[in-house]
Curated annotation (Swiss-Prot):
E.C. designation(s): 2.3.2.27
One GO term (biological process): DNA repair
Taxonomic source organism: Drosophila melanogaster
GO molecular function terms listed in the Swiss-Prot or TrEMBL record: ubiquitin protein ligase activity; zinc ion binding
Protein name: E3 ubiquitin-protein ligase Fancl
DNA damage as UniProt keyword: yes
Pfam families, per the entry: FANCL_C (PF11793), FANCL_d1 (PF09765), FANCL_d2 (PF18890), FANCL_d3 (PF18891)
Claim: Metal-binding is one of the keywords in the record: yes
Amino acid sequence: MESNEDVERLLCQKYPGLAAELQPSGACIIRGVLGSEDTWRRLKLYLPHHPALHGFQLYVQESLEYKLYTSANLKLQDDWLLEDFLDHLPKILPAQKAPTVPKELCREGNIYYDILALYKSNEYCLQVDEACSMIRFSEFTDFEQHYLELKIPSLLLLDHSLPDCVSLGEMLTKSAGNLEEALNLFRKLLEDLRPFYDNFMDIDELCHVLQPSPISSKHKTRLFPLKDRVYLKLTIADPFACIASMSLKIIGPTEEVARLRHVLSDGLSNWDSEMNIHKNLLRMFDLCYFPMPDWSDGPKLDEEDNEELRCNICFAYRLDGGEVPLVSCDNAKCVLKCHAVCLEEWFKTLMDGKTFLEVSFGQCPFCKAKLSTSFAALLND
């Protein structure tokens, strides 16, 4: 028997104007708007023996009233399933009863005609809510994680998947006069941002990204291990100018940070524009690969359950904001491992008037060795 998710997936892929509801009795109710060529039909389909079609009741709006269709006045083939029924419905319903979109309204930019013209594309998924008040584009070709949500018919921006620094709402107001123009603008931005996402893709796949977690298409920062107790923080301030706005910070014990900063400086001066960021970083630090998660088979202890990874202050591994314990001191034998925010709060309770991890102050609360000022970068997201 088809689940509610199966029916919703079918409607999402082929009939974006329809929504389904499964009743506890097993019956299925499908309601909404079904489009075909220049014709829209508002309907309600009741299937008491879902997924079978026998006993169906179909209510179709004609003018201001709903007309009831059953097996008595609507011919169905015996082997039809729900998808066959909906596919053939525009052909088996009386054509003269179907309301059509006036051509003059089409020329003037009728929003529902625009939806009908756009929803058949295989390059994205189009969904409309039951009230026809919101439209969502998602699963774009080459950009599967991205989405655009607009209020209709006003085309007011509701949500999107681009970084927050992209002023999409302002761009839509200035440059998009109809639904197609809004969609084309968003897709153009995706193409313009391709280098931004491509540069992060190798890092996300080939490095052990610790922060942010979970990664989304809105994030402009990646923090991942360079070696034991040493981390790289990559930030791209302007997604439209990846290399020009890129910043790299090395985080870890003082001596290691000082040495690696010289390596970083030399590497940046010899940057290879033919390589992406990931390959340049490997070449810069003379590495074949960065530390990666353990992908081996066999039982592994979950990070949240691994006591060795937990913060020495809050005794948790990952905070609600996605932060993990990365702070350690210059003493390699010290057990200190904690979140930067936890250590900052701990120091605030002890030292009035002191600023955590400034040059003038920063000692390990366990062994009194020096705390590198580089860890302050963890607090500046």
